């Protein structure tokens, strides 16, 4: 085990505070509509330009081990806020820095760190309660667009795209962000359920121009196993032919005699049919087939359930108004499933999302949820250069998470005003002793830091702006740093999702309180290089000097 360097008390806190300041100072320049860019060097390719706090925080690694520990703790604040609400990372970092700074001064003055922490916790509870009390539900499309615009640093085009996407796929739908190959930003929405499996044979194609299968009012057979023998399929095919409706077969695979017969019947025009492979693998495939069955009002044919293919009736098949199959994807629109069954399945998947600890499983469950509950929207972000596209994509990602959070928990005035107003409530908190009172006071001072920083980034005097905002009693009154005017921020469309502001203060206070109560730090000593003998000068072979 290698030797360790240990620092105590003031020494430890000073080093840690230096690390906190380096990271926070780099992150906080991005705050607000007039926040600056940060350029990140990449080991290959062009440098990356971003205004996303967590992206900047993740790039910072300091040489001094003790300073680095402080920086990494604050990086955790940004990461936790990004995970919880998807935005508000810079606000959280600014708050954490302010709490740690004031807290370190109080500890140096001889106050009890544990009582300071209790005071901080009391203050955060009061702030969260105030935010929830003043939160306003998001109802209109315009409000969603405003949230997106603010989070995308004042880019109204992004706000409109997101509002449109949310309107089309609903709150449960999935919105993904990709890089476009063109200059324009586009929105592509897939309504209904889509999975990434195409037709098994191109002979099933009905629309030769677009090379895809299009079927209206189709029956859907959902079979878990492979289909190779025709005999077990024959009774069902005859029943479907009698109805004159098309049939889509979803199975593990269709091959041999079964595939040949289906293709021949399709080409002769006797039976409108198409076959696709089932999506997913293993247990996930079973779950996805069950999703398709519930969406279409059919039954997944599985030997586990004791159902054999030859005994399947028309009543066991799913139905959909439209099915489209191309080379790579299958889309089922307007399945005939009962609303109550679909809602029950959605609730079940939501419960699984809450329980799972794996990020991969959570992502897959959310995809399944979207396919059942809404749809999938893809925003393709365009730009003139790769650097511009990447920077814009970061902002769209932030804005997307912010709009989701706004729909979930509502909105409060932006520009750091909600936290400023909450700071006024902290004067009423009763504490057990003076040290706890100082803990509350630390948070009260810190709550003005985001509004102050937004003003500083806009070239204004932060203290003057904060003073003017607090002079007015009106909750939504604040400073619009984009236009340089004061007024009602909610009516100006300057709003923050309550969830984002709440997560920012909770995460900032949690990590800052830990830093304040730190009394010792342990880090590995830097290894001394045991260098070998130096190379001879010139690097030539012996006896070849000129």
UniProtKB/Swiss-Prot annotation:
Entry's Gene Ontology BP terms: protein refolding
Enzyme class, first EC level, given as a word: isomerase
Family: Belongs to the chaperonin (HSP60) family.
Amino-acid positions noted as binding ATP in the UniProt annotation, renumbered to this chain: 30-33, 51, 87-91, 415, 496
Protein's UniProt name: Chaperonin GroEL 2
UniProt GO MF annotations: ATP binding; ATP-dependent protein folding chaperone; isomerase activity; unfolded protein binding
Enzyme Commission identifier(s): 5.6.1.7
Locations listed in the record: Cytoplasm
UniProt cross-references to Gene3D superfamilies, sorted A to Z: GroEL, GroEL-like equatorial domain, TCP-1-like chaperonin intermediate domain
Main location as per UniProt: cytoplasm
Entry's transmembrane regions: none
Keyword field contains Oxidoreductase: no
One GO cellular component term: cytoplasm
Keywords: ATP-binding, Chaperone, Cytoplasm, Isomerase, Nucleotide-binding
Gene name per UniProt: groEL2
Primary role: Together with its co-chaperonin GroES, plays an essential role in assisting protein folding. The GroEL-GroES system forms a nano-cage that allows encapsulation of the non-native substrate proteins and provides a physical environment optimized to promote and accelerate protein folding.
InterPro entries, sorted: Chaperonin_Cpn60_CS, Cpn60/GroEL, Cpn60/GroEL/TCP-1, GroEL-like_apical_dom_sf, GROEL-like_equatorial_sf, TCP-1-like_intermed_sf
């Amino acid at each position: 085990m290698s030797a360790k360097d240990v620092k105590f008390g003031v020494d430890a806190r000073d080093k840690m505070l230096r690390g906190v300041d380096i990271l926070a100072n780099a992150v906080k320049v991005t705050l607000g509509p007039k926040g600056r860019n940060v350029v990140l060097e990449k080991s290959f390719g062009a440098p990356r330009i971003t205004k996303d706090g967590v992206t900047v925080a993740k790039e910072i690694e300091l040489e001094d081990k003790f300073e680095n520990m402080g920086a990494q703790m604050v990086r955790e604040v940004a990461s936790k806020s990004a995970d919880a609400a998807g935005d508000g990372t810079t606000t959280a970092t600014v708050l954490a820095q302010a709490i740690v700074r004031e807290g370190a001064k109080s500890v140096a003055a001889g106050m009890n760190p544990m009582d300071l922490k209790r005071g901080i916790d009391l203050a955060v509870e009061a702030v969260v309660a105030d935010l929830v009390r003043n939160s306003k539900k998001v109802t209109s499309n315009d409000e969603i667009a405003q949230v997106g615009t603010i989070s995308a640093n004042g880019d109204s085009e992004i706000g409109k795209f997101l509002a449109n996407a949310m309107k089309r796929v609903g709150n449960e739908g999935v919105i993904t962000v990709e890089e476009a190959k063109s200059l324009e930003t586009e929105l592509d929405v897939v309504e209904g359920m889509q999975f990434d499996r195409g037709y098994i044979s191109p002979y099933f194609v009905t629309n030769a121009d677009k090379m895809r299968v299009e079927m209206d009012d189709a029956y859907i057979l959902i079979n878990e196993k492979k289909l190779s023998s025709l005999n077990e399929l024959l009774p069902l095919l005859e029943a479907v032919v009698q109805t004159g409706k098309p049939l889509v077969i979803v199975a593990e695979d269709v091959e041999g005699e079964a595939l040949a017969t289906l293709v021949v019947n399709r080409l002769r025009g006797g039976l409108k049919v198409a076959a696709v492979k089932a999506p997913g693998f293993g247990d996930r495939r079973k779950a996805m087939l069950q999703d398709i069955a519930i969406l279409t009002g059919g039954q997944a044919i599985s030997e586990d359930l004791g159902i054999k293919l030859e005994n399947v009736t028309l009543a066991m098949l799913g139905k959909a108004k439209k099915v489209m199959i191309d080379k790579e994807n299958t889309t089922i629109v307007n399945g005939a499933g009962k609303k109550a069954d679909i809602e029950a399945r959605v609730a079940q998947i939501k419960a699984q999302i809450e329980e799972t600890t794996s990020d991969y499983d959570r992502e897959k469950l959310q995809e399944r949820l979207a396919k059942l509950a809404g749809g999938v929207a893809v925003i393709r972000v365009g730009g003139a250069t790769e650097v511009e596209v990447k920077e814009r994509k970061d902002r769209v990602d932030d804005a997307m998470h912010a709009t989701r959070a706004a729909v979930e928990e509502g909105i409060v005035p932006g520009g750091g005003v909600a936290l400023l107003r909450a700071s006024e409530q902290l004067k009423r908190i009763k504490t057990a002793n003076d040290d706890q009172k100082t803990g509350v006071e630390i948070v009260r001072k810190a709550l003005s830091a985001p509004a102050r920083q937004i003003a500083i980034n806009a070239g204004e005097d932060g203290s003057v702006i904060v003073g003017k905002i607090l002079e007015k009693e009106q909750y939504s009154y604040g400073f619009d740093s984009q236009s340089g005017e004061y007024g009602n921020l909610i009516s100006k469309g300057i709003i923050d999702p309550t969830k984002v502001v709440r997560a920012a203060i909770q995460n900032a206070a949690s990590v800052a309180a830990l830093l304040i109560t730190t009394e010792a730090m342990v880090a590995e000593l830097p290894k001394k290089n045991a260098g070998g003998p130096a190379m001879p000068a010139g690097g030539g072979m012996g006896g070849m000097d000129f």
